[in-house]
Amino acid sequence: MAEDKTKPSELDQGKYDADDNVKIICLGDSAVGKSKLMERFLMDGFQPQQLSTYALTLYKHTATVDGRTILVDFWDTAGQERFQSMHASYYHKAHACIMVFDVQRKVTYRNLSTWYTELREFRPEIPCIVVANKIDDINVTQKSFNFAKKFSLPLYFVSAADGTNVVKLFNDAIRLAVSYKQNSQDFMDEIFQELENFSLEQEEEDVPDQEQSSSIETPSEEAASPHS
């Protein structure tokens, strides 16, 4: 495992409120090729950070969308998926999701419904792309995967091994994330913002009157004396 060189501040998700930052999460069973897809897309220009404390791998990427420079963080599960559930912070402030299954392992396709249900619990509105990975057999692309059709989700046939459709997949995911951020306010974002505002109000109310008044300066007798 790579050394964890990440400072705590680098996991501050407040940065995703900035206009030029987006967060894209990857979901799916173990060994479906999520990490391999990201590495294929980023090629040699990536330095994945293993955040062992948070059980995730963070991939940073800079993209250009409509002439704007966008800083993209791709979040990978780094083993959490073996528990068939992710921590709520993994979904927090995500702007798009890439959900992957292995066309050669039917169980990974069946488990998409579990991942999608959890995604919508935390992020009801963000765009989600379904990815059929490991299409070594071209006949696979002729199969009908009804899950994507059922939920009106885009379906991409890709191969991490030879790169088929990988660049298009990630570029489209970035564009969807940017578009979502510009044009929509997720219900869960509103809830989190309300909770943050409430916490700040509570902190202000808890400050003792003596502490609040301690910053008010009163003139000393020496300063008030006309003979000083």
UniProtKB/Swiss-Prot annotation:
It is found in: Cytoplasm, Cytoskeleton, Microtubule organizing center, Centrosome, Centriole; Cytoplasm, Cytoskeleton, Cilium basal body; Cytoplasm. It comes from the Eukaryota. SMART domains: RAB, RAN, RAS, RHO. GTP binds at residues 28-35, 76-80, 133-136. The keyword GTP-binding applies. One of its GO terms (cellular component) is centriole. Changing D73G: Mild defects in ciliary assembly. Loss of interaction with the intraflagellar transport (IFT) complex B via the IFT74-IFT81 heterodimer. Interacts with CEP19. GO terms for biological process: cilium assembly; intracellular protein transport; intraciliary transport. Interacts (in its GTP-bound form) with CEP19 (via residues 121-150); this interaction is required for its localization to the mother centriole and cilium basal body. Interacts (in its GTP-bound form) with the intraflagellar transport (IFT) complex B (via the IFT74-IFT81 heterodimer). Binding to CEP19 and the IFT74-IFT81 heterodimer is mutually exclusive. Small GTPase required for ciliation. Activated in a guanine nucleotide exchange factor (GEF)-independent manner via its intrinsic GDP for GTP nucleotide exchange ability. Involved in ciliary assembly by binding the intraflagellar transport (IFT) complex B from the large pool pre-docked at the base of the cilium and thus triggers its entry into the cilia. This is Rab-like protein 2B. The lineage of its organism: Eukaryota, Metazoa, Chordata, Craniata, Vertebrata. The gene is RABL2B.
